UniProtKB/Swiss-Prot annotation:
GO cellular component: ribonucleoprotein complex; ribosome
Protein name per Swiss-Prot or TrEMBL: Small ribosomal subunit protein uS8
Bridged cysteine pairs (disulfide): none
Lineage: Bacteria, Pseudomonadati, Pseudomonadota, Betaproteobacteria, Burkholderiales
Entry's family note: Belongs to the universal ribosomal protein uS8 family.
Organism: Bordetella petrii (strain ATCC BAA-461 / DSM 12804 / CCUG 43448)
Underlying gene: rpsH
Amino acid sequence: MSMSDPIADMLTRIRNAQQVDKVTVSMPSSKLKAAIAAVLQDEGYIDGFEVKGTQAKPELEITLKYYAGRPVIERIERVSRPGLRIYKGRSNIPQVMNGLGVAIVSTSRGVMTDRKARANGVGGEVLCYVA
């Protein structure tokens, strides 16, 4: 069975793993998933990630982060999806929780946070919100 939305699958795996206090979570890898994981690591939402396996079937392993026994990621939700893509210009990129969370945006200059996109003066597809 083909997966219609691999990014939503990635976010759901992270959410489910944190609900049962898993240390790591694995999923099929792609360049976009690795870029999203890199943004999550830069922002301090995960401890790290690693691409494992063969080139034919790479696996992305994410090490989750907890603080005082609770997951660091309180909320992670998909915004743009295959049935309804959400694109925002550089002046319309949304803030999450008045700047306490991040929106992950896919731009022509790569995957970045809403703050970096505004600083670089680029818009793009709003992939997800993380808080």
